[in-house]
Amino acid sequence: MPADIMEKNSSSPVAATPASVNTTPDKPKTASEHRKSSKPIMEKRRRARINESLSQLKTLILDALKKDSSRHSKLEKADILEMTVKHLRNLQRAQMTAALSTDPSVLGKYRAGFSECMNEVTRFLSTCEGVNTEVRTRLLGHLANCMTQINAMTYPGQAHPALQAPPPPPPSGPAGPQHAPFAPPPPPLVPIPGGAAPPPGSAPCKLGSQAGEAAKVFGGFQVVPAPDGQFAFLIPNGAFAHSGPVIPVYTSNSGTSVGPNAVSPSSGSSLTSDSMWRPWRN
């Protein structure tokens, strides 16, 4: 009897049907589900990349700083990053110093570039609506502080920008068709006869209308061209108040001096009563 029951159970079509026939197939995964399922794998790969980069960075920074790697075998990630930042800042300062020593205009270019970037950031923050007000204020304040520090920078051998004297203005030469501004080689020294210092504001001499119009002021002295092509220097009284260096007087395009001797402005006791020194007189 038990054998007959076993035969009936084995011959039943329901028992012979596999269980997988009654189950429904799996639905395809959506993009979000796929991201969720692959997120642990991506996180593991990201951590592995970070650790590998930090390991290489640790080796490089210890070699650059010439430190024994055996004594720094257990450095934290934050320590490695801080050492790298300090090393890069030192390299940047060294490169800036070397560049300034070879070309002083580098600092001006750097200031101009930083100022342009700061203006662009300010322009963007003033038009962008999604930036927090506190963040905007802090960022602009930080850029302003950096700009102040950059303006205070000087290259080796240069004084502070606020202490530098402005360059002297280029002198204006006397009027003439073929005369360039006074910049010849060391000029001959010419004696300054007496009486060459009229009081300020007084008319120096009676020249023609064209000669009077051509009179120019050069370096504190009034230059009066003579009809024969030479020039006369009118020296104010203040030039003889204190002793000073010898005053060079330039002559016409012939390049010759009127006299072989030279006197100092302090020799005011030998002045004569002439109102003006005329080099064309012998």
UniProtKB/Swiss-Prot annotation:
Q: Where is this region: Disordered?
A: 1-44, 158-204, 256-282
Which positions fall inside the bHLH domain? 34-91
Q: What's a Gene Ontology MF term here?
A: chromatin binding
CDD domains linked: bHLH-O_HES1_4
Subcellular location per UniProt equals: Nucleus
| Assigned keywords, A-Z | DNA-binding, Nucleus, Repressor, Transcription, Transcription regulation
The Orange domain extends over 110-143
User: What is known about the tissue distribution of this protein?
Assistant: Expressed at high levels in undifferentiated neural precursor cells, but the level of expression decreases as neural differentiation proceeds.
Tree of life domain: Eukaryota
> Which spans are transmembrane here?
none
The biased composition feature labelled Basic and acidic residues covers 26-35
Output the InterPro entries linked to this UniProt entry.
bHLH_dom, HES_HEY, HLH_DNA-bd_sf, Orange_dom
What binding partners and quaternary form does the record give? Interacts with SIRT1. Transcription repression requires formation of a complex with a corepressor protein of the Groucho/TLE family. Interacts (via WPRW motif) with TLE1, and more weakly with TLE2. Interacts with HES6. Interacts with an FA complex, composed of FANCA, FANCF, FANCG and FANCL, but not of FANCC, nor FANCE.
| Domain characteristics, as noted in the entry | Has a particular type of basic domain (presence of a helix-interrupting proline) that binds to the N-box (CACNAG), rather than the canonical E-box (CANNTG).
Q: What is this protein called?
A: Transcription factor HES-1
Which species is the source of this protein?
A: Mus musculus (Mouse)
